[in-house]
Amino acid sequence: MSQKRKLLPAALGLLSLASLSVTAADTLSLQGKTIGVAVVGTQHFWDREAFKGATEEVEKLGGKVIGVDGGRDNQVHANNHDILLSRKVDAVISILGDSAVEPKFKALRDAGIPVFTVDHVSQYSVNNTTSDNYTLGSTIGRYMADELGGKGNVAVFNAFSSALRICGIRYDQWKYVLKDYPDIHIIQPELAEQFANSP
């Protein structure tokens, strides 16, 4: 059998799969479904845009959204998941949060409600969508070091590295890269904004 004849069935199979994927995407619908969208707070641009993007996508797919905002208080954010559980939503998208949400995620899962997380790794989540925080931190470190020509003093605003895993990863990777630049010094003490219920 010639090489062309061997490749033809494979090519036709891939073409069929591709057309099925397009058809499935065209008919994807949340019609008749209610999706809870919980965010730790909408005070920050990224958080607000993630919340907005999630709610708009659910609505675009025909679903109804029940949105809850924790007002930047992790306990309020966690408790908001009880509201979604009592409303018997079909699924929950949860954006950020700390360990206080874990028992809430478990309760949702036990009730048969899937939880999808954003920037929060959880054993109870079906899926976690997150940035590559390791690459972000190291890239920022290399970029900054290059821009400084490998020497200088740096003031660091480090409010959340111990409170938010994603910030901690970025900070740790940034600092790790700086080990290769002994002439770059971090001004002490590091700057940090302190406020109630941070982050």
Where do the language-model regions lie?
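Gram-negative bacterial Sec-dependent N-terminal signal peptides
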Residues: 2-23
